[in-house]
Amino acid sequence: MMRAKAYAAGTVLNALPTGIGSAFGIEMHTIVKLRPSDELKVFVNGVERRSIVAERILNSMDVTAEVIVESEIPGGSGLGSSSAFVNALICAVKKMKGEELNAFEILRSNARFSLEAGISYTGAFDDASASMLGGFVVSDNRKMRLIRTDEFEGYSAVLIPKFSRGKVDWRRLRERASEVEGAVEAAMRGEYCKAMKLNTEYICKMLGYPLEIAEKGWEKGICCGISGNGPSYVAFGSKNEMEALAETWGEYGRVYVRRVADEPAEDVVIPTPFFRKLDG
């Protein structure tokens, strides 16, 4: 049985408004195991489900298998669960076929499959990159290129709130994209805490999430904010900071404290053309 894994992704900058996104890898895992079979079946945490994206991936790669998914990343939470699943599945298939794990090819395929299957508005190249590579990334999702990457040794707090995701009006988010330009500029400079704060103020205002959850962290000088299109909130910093924030956030839902992923989830090859020139 072949297996591969990928990380959760916490958001610094939502890519929906401008096409530029930023995220970081979190040590919450999705593991995909492949068992050769005459029939495609997908089991997610023990429950059989149909997966259009899995069908597209396996058919395009000429593989038939039973797909067993073990994931601790909640779906529809803003933590890149779909990106992690697609990353792990593509890597597992490539391993099964004895192919090189070229990060650029895998992540471009991830974005393409995600768009075709309708599980992402932007292709989520930022989430996919953080999910595979770990650390912090800034990406141009439209050109499917990385702008910068940064390592970080520390921890993350992840809040899964009691409330669910609201409606995402992506057109409205893009129409007022100028309001988030400061966050884009900060992310490109590697000022992730500032970018996260500006992004959170915008996304919470536009999608109706409570800003007070992030403000509880900001009051303590902690870098935190809304993740993806919500409803989860994430933070990064020292272990002590994350444990203190977990106590504060506990009233809003379940909180996990995990390491920020500091190495790729799989033994991937990272080619130079992966990066976009800032003037490109």
Curated annotation (Swiss-Prot):
Subcellular location(s) per record: Cytoplasm
UniProt keyword terms in alphabetical order: Amino-acid biosynthesis, Aromatic amino acid biosynthesis, ATP-binding, Cytoplasm, Kinase, Nucleotide-binding, Transferase
GO MF, one example: shikimate kinase activity
EC number from the UniProt entry: 2.7.1.71
Domain of life of the native organism: Archaea
GO biological process: amino acid biosynthetic process; aromatic amino acid family biosynthetic process; chorismate biosynthetic process
Pfam family, one: GHMP_kinases_N
Reaction(s) catalysed by this chain's protein: shikimate + ATP = 3-phosphoshikimate + ADP + H(+)
Positions of ATP binding: 74-84
Pathways per UniProt: Metabolic intermediate biosynthesis; chorismate biosynthesis; chorismate from D-erythrose 4-phosphate and phosphoenolpyruvate: step 5/7
GO cellular component, one term: cytoplasm
Family to which the UniProt record says this protein belongs: Belongs to the GHMP kinase family. Archaeal shikimate kinase subfamily.
Listed name of the protein: Shikimate kinase
Species annotation: Archaeoglobus fulgidus (strain ATCC 49558 / DSM 4304 / JCM 9628 / NBRC 100126 / VC-16)
